[in-house]
Swiss-Prot record:
Annotated stretches, region: Interaction with DNA: 70-83, 94-106
Signal peptide: none
Encoding gene per record: sox18-a
Residue ranges the UniProt entry marks as DNA-binding: 68-136
One GO CC annotation: nucleus
Record note on domains: Binds target DNA via the HMG box domain. The 9aaTAD motif is a transactivation domain present in a large number of yeast and animal transcription factors.
Name under which the protein is recorded: Transcription factor Sox-18A
Region (Important for transcriptional activation) residue spans: 149-210
Tissue distribution: Expressed in the adult spleen, lung, heart and kidney, and at a lower level in the adult testis, liver and brain.
Chain intervals for the UniProt region annotation (Disordered): 20-66, 129-163
Chain location of the short sequence motif 9aaTAD per the record: 308-316
Keyword tags: DNA-binding, Nucleus, Transcription, Transcription regulation
Major subcellular site: nucleus
Length: 363
């Protein structure tokens, strides 16, 4: 017999009246005292099952149900008794070894020997289908604790060995690093020689030779000015420099008449070009000089250029020792050129020289 909802409310109001007050059950719930002794409950009567209204839901009953096993196949039917027999004969063998032995023995059986077990497995499948018509196979999910237990030891060991030496660097430190080209920390160390400097094209084992009249100290023109003045002829100049040359004086003279990029880099406003010694780096470009040369155009640069400056390169070629090659020989390996190619190269060199001198003559 279950109590109604109103009886619970009366009990709560009675308990809240005071501590010293005694609880008196309501009249409808007072059991009647009978002189006749009540008979004990029968032992076979089942205990009353709780109803869902008192905290027991259908979900809890569903979880409490035993898991429905899948029907056994023919191998499982055969191995059920065979495993017991092997375990009794070999009590020291591990279960994995027994499974391997059972699998090998099942493969060695013929189809006639397997037939009774196959028929028994089919009978079990039909019986299972009748007992559980709505059965749907749901594989058990692996517990995450076991997976984490297998994965945890290696990182812990690595962390313990790493923290003894030095603290671990946060990965965000490498993401926040700026590119090497854009960092301002390298500016305080000074920049090396520019890209087209004559010192860059020399081999480390080759000594440099400079005439005495070329060792005067003057300020070099910034490298950006060289790029501004030589953009129109960069492609043709590099194509001519990459061509191999012969040892004939006529071809060497025509080749040296063409202004080299390094010559224009070191001096663009007249005067002799300057080459620093090998052990000394050229200073980095200065910002004030760079801003002052931005407004100059191509005609002004070539108008102030000294035409007789290239004689110094011819003098250097005459005083150069025979054992040393031209500094630009690093770009193209020296080889002998046939006679029919000498005239073509000389004509191309003269045409490029005329193109260089045209702004100087007309301006």
């Amino acid at each position: 017999m279950h109590r109604s909802e109103s009886s619970y409310c009366r009990e709560e109001t009675t308990l809240c009246q005071g501590v010293n007050s005694t609880w008196v059950p309501p009249a409808d719930t007072v059991p009647e005292v009978s002189l006749i002794p009540s008979s004990p409950p029968a032992p076979d009567s089942p205990a009353p099952s709780p109803k869902p209204g008192y905290g027991f839901s259908t979900c809890e009953e569903k979880h409490g149900d035993p898991r429905i096993r899948r029907p056994m196949n023919a191998f499982m039917v055969w191995a059920k008794d065979e495993r017991k027999r092997l375990a009794q004969q070999n009590p020291d063998l591990h279960n994995a070894v027994l499974s391997k032995m059972l699998g090998q023995s099942w493969k060695n059986l013929t189809s006639v020997e397997k037939r009774p077990f196959v028929e028994e497995a089919e009978r079990l499948r039909v019986q299972h289908l009748q007992d559980h018509p709505n059965y749907k196979y749901r594989p058990r999910r692996k517990k995450q604790a076991k997976k984490l237990k297998r994965m945890d030891p290696s990182p812990l060991l690595r962390n313990e060995g790493f923290t003894r030496g030095q603290p671990m660097v946060n990965l965000s430190h490498f993401r926040n690093l700026h590119p090497l080209g854009g960092s301002g920390e390298l500016e305080s160390y000074g920049l090396p020689t520019p890209e087209m400097s004559p010192l860059d094209v020399l081999e480390p084992s080759e000594p440099a030779f400079f005439p005495p009249h070329m060792r005067e100290d003057t300020d070099p023109v910034p490298f950006r000015t060289y790029q501004h003045g030589m953009d129109f002829s960069q492609e043709k100049t590099m194509r001519e420099i990459s061509l191999p040359y012969s040892s004939s004086p006529s071809h060497m003279g025509s080749f040296l008449r063409t202004p080299t990029p390094s010559a224009f880099y070191y001096k663009a406003h007249g005067g002799s070009p300057v080459c620093t010694p090998l052990g000394q780096l050229s200073p980095p470009p200065e910002a004030p000089a760079l801003d002052a040369m931005d407004h100059l155009n191509q005609a002004e640069l070539w108008g102030d250029f000294d035409r007789n400056e290239f004689d110094q390169y011819l003098n250097m070629s005459r005083t150069q020792r025979p054992g040393y090659s031209f500094p630009m020989s690093k770009l193209g390996a020296p080889r002998t050129i046939p006679c029919e190619e000498n005239s073509l190269i000389s004509a191309l060199s003269d045409a490029s020289t005329a193109m260089y001198y045209t702004p100087c003559i007309t301006g």
